[in-house]
């Protein structure tokens, strides 16, 4: 049975006030004492009385999320995986989410209401766009926040956790180029989101280093579903000069692309190579595809947990985190990538000389 505050204090040989201040992040409690208290909390299963803490500290012990309701976002399994990481960390620290659905055009007003309500101590934002106005707005509201991703243009002095998307797709494209591929297709996420912009940039950079250009006809942007991956791949394969390799911004897109490739009677890794970005979705493991996928790997759940840890640490004055974190994706080579196939035309037969 979990202990109460008095029992926890007696166990530690500290006053209830000291234990309470350690739990609430007061700076006058030294690091050693705070560490002892937190360790005892983990061992005993102690849960603080949040109602009493709110009265004592003025904190809500809640993280705010403005939930986008634009088409294709609310049902996105990638967003769900990110939220799962956030939720796991929040539960660990007995924090809550305050979810506020909002259409894109109402987002600013929703954030303002959330900040004014006092129901949250901090917020996070995701689905970053170029020159994203939300960063300056949150700064003006003076509410703590962390960004999942980065904007392009605008201010640079804001806290974020992001994946090096340019570097990830540069590495992937360079591998394909080293294998002899020069017609590389891209099945990407929504065109206006910065992770998609940066992934395309990585591919363009790798091609340019070898004097090659990206064929715009071999690029498709969409919501990241298997059906969109299927349709995009079908379209590419019907072209007069189809790609010999394809980059997919998600294993979900790759699932559809693989279906189209199989229906066309092509062999993955031989007739066409495929690399996908792996967000480490538990229900879709790249090694379990019929042909194991080469991937760039970075966990969405880990990113969600990290952002929650940073927000909670800031609220409780615990932990020392870098302002900006750019994670490198790991390139994992499997069987879906191989040398470019020889698609050169057959030579014309030599004319016969003379006759019988």
Curated annotation (Swiss-Prot):
The keyword Cytoplasm does not apply. Residues 5-24 bind DNA. SMART domains: HTH_LACI (SM00354). Transmembrane segments: none annotated. Residues 1-57 form the HTH lacI-type domain. The keyword Membrane does not apply. Residues 337-356 are annotated as: Disordered. One of its GO terms (molecular function) is DNA-binding transcription factor activity. Keywords: DNA-binding, Transcription, Transcription regulation. Probable regulatory protein for the binding-protein-dependent transport system for alpha-glucosides such as sucrose, maltose and trehalose. This is HTH-type transcriptional regulator AglR. The gene is aglR.
